[in-house]
């Protein structure tokens, strides 16, 4: 009985370790950064509690209207919003959260760019938050 329980526990821990590797370490080798969504500004496209993967290797010049990007604000805060207007000459974007009624105040510069969203896993971020605690 103990050996069976031990095998199940080992299997579970191995599965959790592999899932962690696949969710966090493997994507980073391809330039992707996992981020947990904590606000509802991008709902319904990206629900609160999702994990999104952004790729910083996609160049700023290749971002177009409709793309979802992550960008940094002062104090280490990052934002994930949709590009609604692009100005390649000034090297800026206008962004807006899908759930917001108006565009974000101010422009986002190319220097603030953290990456383009590649894909998301809805609600998986809740699990990650629980495991971190």
Model-identified regions with their sequence ranges:
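Short coil-to-beta-strand transition motifs
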Residues: 72-81, 107-109
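Extended, hydrophilic extramembrane loops/domains of integral membrane proteins
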Residues: 91-129
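Conserved positions in beta-strands of structured domains
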Residues: 38, 84-86
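Structural motif
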Residues: 49-51, 64-67
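Residue-level recognition of conserved beta-strand edge/terminus positions
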Residues: 54-55, 72, 116
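Protein maturation boundaries and topogenic segments
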Residues: 1-59, 122-133
């Amino acid at each position: 009985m103990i050996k069976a329980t031990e095998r199940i526990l080992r299997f579970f821990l191995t599965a959790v370790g592999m899932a962690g590797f696949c969710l966090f370490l493997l994507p980073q080798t391809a330039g992707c950064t996992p981020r947990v969504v904590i606000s509802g500004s991008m709902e319904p496209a990206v629900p609160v509690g999702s994990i999104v993967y952004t790729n910083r290797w996609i160049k700023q010049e290749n971002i177009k209207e409709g793309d979802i990007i992550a960008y940094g604000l002062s104090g280490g805060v990052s934002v994930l919003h949709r590009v609604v207007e692009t100005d390649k000459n000034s090297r800026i974007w206008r962004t807006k959260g899908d759930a917001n009624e108006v565009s974000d105040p101010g422009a986002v510069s190319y220097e603030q760019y953290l990456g383009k969203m590649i894909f998301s896993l809805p609600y998986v971020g809740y699990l990650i938050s629980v495991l971190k605690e």
